[in-house]
A protein has these predicted regions:
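Conserved NB-ARC/NACHT P-loop NTPase core of NLR-like innate immune receptors
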Residues: 1-191
Length: 191
């Protein structure tokens, strides 16, 4: 256990290939498990929550998990809690899935609007209309890696370096090398 007074960190990487990592239930469960190990205060709250759900034999609802997280964030005198949601755009955006991206966005909006004194959030995502619509009004600080000037230039520099320093560079005609560079930059799509 960590002592009270030290910051806590919980992160969640959204992954469309893993059902447990693309929705609200997985996100909340992951945050709570990580926080459980970081402070005696968190331990007590989460252990009580676990006991209320028959020691894990009765799965909690998403609403119950969200309320437990809010209870942790409301504990008095705690140091900052950093919650990181990485690759939010990988959360499924289809209503047939139990917990969709819209539910995760709703939770983020709710947590930010509640203005918990100790909450710090970082959300990463590719630009998507539904995500931008919810997050833009909430953002205190935004860093875009999708602008044409920065990331694309880095990718272009790297591709040129690799092709121009390749041992078989002399085998290619200059126009073919330039065409290969142009196609690779275009197809990289910022990745």
């Amino acid at each position: 256990m960590r002592k009270a007074g030290l910051a806590s960190l919980a992160f969640f990487y959204c992954d469309f290939r893993d059902d447990r990592k693309k929705g609200l239930h997985g996100l909340l469960s992951s945050f709570l498990v990580q926080l459980y190990h970081q402070s005696d205060s968190y331990f007590d709250v989460i252990y009580d929550f676990y006991s209320e759900h028959d020691r894990g034999s009765r799965p909690p609802s998403d609403d119950a998990l969200a309320e437990c997280l809010k209870e942790l964030l409301n504990l008095p005198g705690l140091a900052p809690v950093y919650l990181i949601v990485d690759a939010l755009d990988e959360c499924t955006n289809q209503s047939v899935v139990r917990s969709s991206r819209a539910e995760v966005l709703s939770l983020i909006k709710e947590l930010v609007k509640a203005k918990f004194h100790n909450l710090r959030m970082c959300v990463t995502s590719r630009p998507e209309l539904d995500i931008n619509a919810v997050l833009d009004p909430l953002i205190f600080c935004s860093i875009s890696l999708h602008d044409e000037s920065g990331q694309k230039r880095d990718i272009e520099d790297y591709i040129k370096f690799v092709i121009n320093t390749h041992p078989k560079k002399g085998v290619w005609k200059e126009e073919h090398r330039k065409h290969a560079i142009d196609v690779l930059i275009e197809k990289s799509n910022g990745m």
